[in-house]
Amino acid sequence: MFENHISPWMDEELHIMRDAVHKFLAREFVPHMARWEKQGCIDRDAWNKAGTAGLLCVSIPAQYGGGGGNFKHEMVLVEELCYAHISGFGNSVHSGIVAHYINSYGSEEQKQKWLPKMASGEIVSAIAMTEPGTGSDLQAVATTAIKNGENYVLNGQKTFLTNGQTANLICVVVKTDPSASAKGISLIMVETESVEGDGGFSRGRNLEKLGLKAQDTSEIFFDDVLVPSENLLGNVEGKGFVQLMEQLPKERLIIAAGACAAIETALRITAEYVKERDRKSTRLNSSHVVISYAVFCLKNKNK
């Protein structure tokens, strides 16, 4: 972004990836952003195009269809999305969060079943944590999954679901033991195509937001939804809270990286504006206040 700055974590491979991502976004995403913001979500085939370009699940092992990269590869993608002003592509949830729950806790069968399709874009995923009455207090979730024979019966409601209108695979935080607190929480994967409509699963409205206009953020509802018991992540009930706590630090770091990239983008736009705009026949960059603030931001942007 800034000519004289070289990030300490970038290497030649990441620079090559950054250039490829930049070109892909400029060709396939940027021209459609205005329309996507009006319709409230990106086009479904944009996921398939990203998968074909190798931009989904870049830090998932190649044996499961992923890119075989690491967290740095995910960060390059996060940054380039911010630099290109792409606000609606929920790939951080899809690739950076849900895919890693499956890769970390899923059985070999679950990994082989879902991860390759997530990497190709055939599957779009979401994670359902937040509920209307509990916010981010995960121990207090009210959505239940009660074992009944070979299935779990899900009942409850989730909200603020990124990719909520598009996702066909959702990692749902549930109580398999409603009488317990943290130790009653489990993670269950819901394949929506088999339960939507008459199966008791439904999607609510696409929520209106102040920003992220092209990102579908939704409510979802479970009314006696039957999910095969084999869709439990980790094979043992009650492990969900520990799984969440193990993954949440990385999830928060993804958010932080995106925020830093957004700040960097705002700085660039501001610098360009200051250079170009005249203010009472005096350019803004001659203002002591503007110069001092810009210098402060540039010096501290990577701290």
What is each model feature region?
Residues N91, M118, G133-S136, F160-N163, ...:
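Short Gly/Pro-enriched turn/cap motifs at secondary-structure boundaries
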